[in-house]
Amino acid sequence: MRGGELVALLAGALLVAGYSWAEQGEPRAVAALANADGTRPGLKPITGKRERAAAVRLISKVRVGEPGSMAGYHRERFGKKWTDAAKGVPYAGNGCRTRDDLLARDGTGVRYRRGSDCVVVAMTLADPYTGKKIEWRKREHYRVQVDHVVPLSYGWRMGASRWPQAKRVRIANDPLNLLPVSGAVNEAKGGAGPAEWLPPQRKIRCAYAVRFAQVAVKYDLAVTRADKIAMLRQCR
């Protein structure tokens, strides 16, 4: 039997058995520049000259501003946590919490609670920030957190404090601004911008800067001068 025929036969057997290559843990991440609405999984490193040049052009569009204070900030200013009621963003209104939507988007071998097609109880995550695989179970929920690429507290200081409530709810639940990652790494990031924090995995940093810029441009959100310089540096 030829190699190609064998691969096709094995692939067919897996499909009959109810599996896909993604469920077996194959990489699924796509490039940020090819994922403008955030509905495709993960972050793929940006390595080619053309892609890096496109990344620099995008980051160059981000406005620079001065940060304001944290006065008046609390999480509820951005709506109920993981609400399905955001307007104008993918997945909203599908009956599932935003967190579960994102776990299902980025996880492989996803398993749901019995009787539910929403509540994710197990999956394997290829963590874009560390490059490590995490075998996640809901009983250890803290091991995977959904990161706001542009932290909500950062957004508040950079202008979201003046936004209508509905716009804050959108950025808090927009899949473009959300990545399931290592819980410990997300805790270490906190509300920091790119000048203060970047993913430990160096090869993903340009892609991270692009995703940060995509969110900033979409919501017309300014970043600090230091953050813009740091973002550009990752892709040059």
Task: Give each language-model segment a name.
Residues 48-52, 118-121, 178:
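Compositionally biased, low-hydrophobicity segments enriched in charged and small polar residues
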Residues 65-145, 149-150:
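Secreted/periplasmic proteins that engage bacterial cell-wall peptidoglycan
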Residues 120, 128-236:
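Domain-level detector of nuclease and nuclease-like folds
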Residues 22-92, 96, 227:
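N-terminal module-boundary/linker segments of secreted carbohydrate-active enzymes
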Residues 60-67, 78, 108, 214-217, ...:
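Generic surface-pattern signal
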Residues 1-24:
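Secretory targeting and sorting signals
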